[in-house]
Regions:
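Hydrophobic faces of well-ordered beta-strands that scaffold small-molecule active sites
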Residues: 34-40, 61-63, 93-97, 131-135, ...
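Substrate-binding cleft of secreted/luminal carbohydrate-active enzymes
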Residues: 245, 249-314
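Structural motif corresponding to the early beta-alpha repeats
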Residues: 61-67, 79-109, 135-136
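Bacterial N-terminal signal peptides that target proteins for export
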Residues: 2-10
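Active-site cleft segment of glycoside hydrolase catalytic domains centered on the general acid/base Glu
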Residues: 44-47, 71-78, 103-204, 211-230, ...
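Boundary/entry segment of secreted carbohydrate-active catalytic domains
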Residues: 25-66
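Sec/Tat signal peptide C-region and signal peptidase I cleavage site
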Residues: 20-24
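Bacterial N-terminal signal peptides
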Residues: 10-18
């Protein structure tokens, strides 16, 4: 009797797993079975990097572009070159798009329409390579929302973006808004999302956030909150750990990355991007400079092997 019960339970769990994985592939058609990628910077992302990223077991790359720089020919070429590097290794792209300059607070509708046009142009150019377009990055931080006054400026702008985008059928999934912290009960991001999603329920395919410093249980709770409140899946568009001595140095970084990848695989997160492939010499402090799986010169750190081991473990 117990054996039959266990078999039924095993069958049910297998079916649930199949549904979850089917959901992931339906959500992001250009994403292969594996759903973990890594962030790169367009200014120094090379064909060689792409080959090593693919060999390590990552299934996509994430990089960002600035909508208000896209009119410059040199910048257009830099973006095109980054896509070409990714294509050389068969790596699709999670493309994060935001503006650098403050938006005109007295004309957010026009600004939203203009931003939507930039998104549509990128989608038209690169849809065959896109995992998804991520709309904005950490707007809940003033650094990345220079317009300021998030509570009063974010929703009008994003509603204008969604209104402009609804006129054409999307060929690429859209995720938003790369929050620095996941939405929680009563938070500014939850209030904003509730208004946007109720007004434009088809604007986004998933809610993205950055769970730095969060435990697996906290991430699981965030996923549940997002699904229950917005009826959309949650995805992790950025997470990393710096190789500071306070984190255990290079070995501590490696251990924490291995644990994180194991956790998101177990939690069946539909998409996760690790920050980042190489150290950033341009970081503003030691913490910001040492998130890479490789040194800035391209030498592997222990974190690269730790990530590859987890990524290639079924």
């Amino acid at each position: 009797m117990k054996s039959a019960h266990l078999k039924r339970l095993a069958s049910a769990l297998l079916a649930l797993s199949a549904v979850t994985h089917a959901h992931a592939s339906e959500l992001f058609p250009n994403l292969p079975a594996k759903t973990i990628g890594v962030q790169v910077k367009i200014q120094n992302f090379t064909v060689e990097d792409a080959a090593h990223i693919k060999a390590a077991g990552f299934s996509f790359v994430r990089f960002g572009v600035w909508s208000d720089s896209l009119s410059a020919k040199a910048y257009q070429q830099q973006v095109s070159d980054a896509f070409a590097a990714a294509r050389s290794a068969g790596l699709p792209v999670l493309l994060t798009v935001r503006a650098l300059k403050p938006l005109p607070a007295n004309d957010l509708a026009t600004a939203g329409e203009s931003f939507a046009n930039a998104l549509a142009g990128l989608e038209k150019s690169y849809s065959a390579q896109l995992v998804a377009i991520e709309i904005w990055n950490e707007p809940d931080l003033d650094t990345y929302w220079p317009t300021r006054n998030f509570d009063t400026t974010f929703v009008p702008f994003m509603n204008a973006v969604c209104k402009s985008l609804q006129g054409t059928a999307p060929t690429t999934p859209r995720v938003g808004y790369g929050f620095a912290r996941p939405p929680t009960a009563g938070s500014a991001s939850t209030v904003a999302l509730s208004r946007i999603v109720s007004e434009y329920p088809k604007c986004l395919n998933a809610i993205s956030y950055h769970p730095y410093g969060m435990t697996a249980t906290q991430i699981s709770n965030a996923q549940t909150f997002i699904q229950q409140n917005f009826h959309l899946p949650g995805v992790i568009s950025e997470w990393g750990i710096s190789a500071l001595s306070s984190n255990g140095g290079n070995d501590g970084q490696a251990s924490k990355i291995a644990s994180f990848i194991a956790d998101v695989k177990r939690l069946n997160i539909p998409l996760t991007s690790i920050y980042e492939w190489k150290n950033s010499d341009t970081g503003s402090n030691d913490r910001e400079k040492n998130f890479g799986l490789l040194t800035s010169g391209g030498q592997p750190k222990p974190a690269k092997l730790a990530a590859a081991t987890q990524l290639n473990t079924q």
